[in-house]
Amino acid sequence: MQMCEQLGQINTTIMTNSIDNAVRLMLNKLPEVELLGGKIDKGNRYTYSMETLSQLDNITFDAAFIGTSKIQPDGVMVVDSYDAAIAKKVVERSRKVILIAQKYKFVTNNSSPYKSANLKDIDVLITDVPLEEKYRKYFKPDIKIKYVKEDETK
């Protein structure tokens, strides 16, 4: 959601399946927003469908911003299989993949069984504090890491 505030004046098109992100992005004239369709997961506030996955096969993204509920040595993890499937497809179809993850996502014990991306596919990591070397090694050597404190996005 904080990233949406940063994107509020950029002349681009943002495609999302997140209801909350779409609503936040609509507060400004720019950017143009496309909400992917399908069923609504009311608990997690996103949309999903098989048609969405097919639609994504025909799109190439300049950049994909993805989130996570947990980071493990083998990947970016989320709590729902539909969310994972959409994120995987977007990662496949993107020229650049940007992961947004606070440091606690590396140490959480939350159950997040579905992999949405391989860590080697991540080009940029946006996080809140410098990573310990053991976590930095999860990613490819040339990853760009941007540290953003929460209040820097306001």
Residue spans for each PLM region:
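Glycine-rich beta-alpha loop segments
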Residues: Q2-G8
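Short active-site oxyanion
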Residues: Q9-I14, D121-V124
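Conserved SAM-binding loop
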Residues: I14-M15, V79
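Conserved phosphate- and dinucleotide-binding cores of soluble alpha/beta proteins
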Residues: A22-K154
